[in-house]
Amino acid sequence: MRLFILVLTLLFGWLQYTLWFGKNGVSDYYTIESDIEAQQLVNTKLQARNSEMYAEIDDLKQGLDAIEERARHELGMLKEGETFYRIVGEENQ
């Protein structure tokens, strides 16, 4: 009977160890849970960026205003008949 109780105690101890510290145990669960939260935050940021890109793509496909704005700001282009004026501030000496 003592041997049976000893075996059951050892089995219970082994099961508790694997539950708390073993593969797919509680410690792994909490680690994976924190990894999931971090990945969800990254995914949210990427979804927001993708939404902005889709909106810009739609704007470029449908209207000439966005194309004109990009040409003016990124390429420095002007419309025919426009004059470009640059105002330079004074440097402190």
Curated annotation (Swiss-Prot):
Which protein, by its recorded name, is this?
Cell division protein FtsB
Residue runs in coiled coils = 42-75
Quick one: which gene encodes this?
ftsB
Q: Share what the entry says about its subunit structure, partners included.
A: Part of a complex composed of FtsB, FtsL and FtsQ.
Q: Which InterPro entries match?
A: Cell_div_FtsB (IPR023081), FtsL/DivIC (IPR007060)
The UniProt keywords, alphabetically, are: Cell cycle, Cell division, Cell inner membrane, Cell membrane, Coiled coil, Membrane, Transmembrane, Transmembrane helix
Q: Which domain of life is it from?
A: Bacteria
Source species, please?
Vibrio vulnificus (strain YJ016)
Transmembrane regions: 4-21
HAMAP family linked to this entry: FtsB (MF_00599)
Q: Which GO terms describe its biological process?
A: FtsZ-dependent cytokinesis
Family per record? Belongs to the FtsB family.
* Membrane association type: Single-pass type II membrane protein
Cross-referenced NCBIfam families: PRK00888.1 (NF002058)
Q: Cellular location of this protein?
A: Cell inner membrane
Q: What does this protein do?
A: Essential cell division protein. May link together the upstream cell division proteins, which are predominantly cytoplasmic, with the downstream cell division proteins, which are predominantly periplasmic.
Periplasmic-facing ranges? 22-93
One Pfam family per UniProt: DivIC
Record topological domains on the Cytoplasmic side: 1-3
**Cellular compartments per GO CC:** cell division site; cell septum; plasma membrane
Q: Does the keyword Zinc apply?
A: no
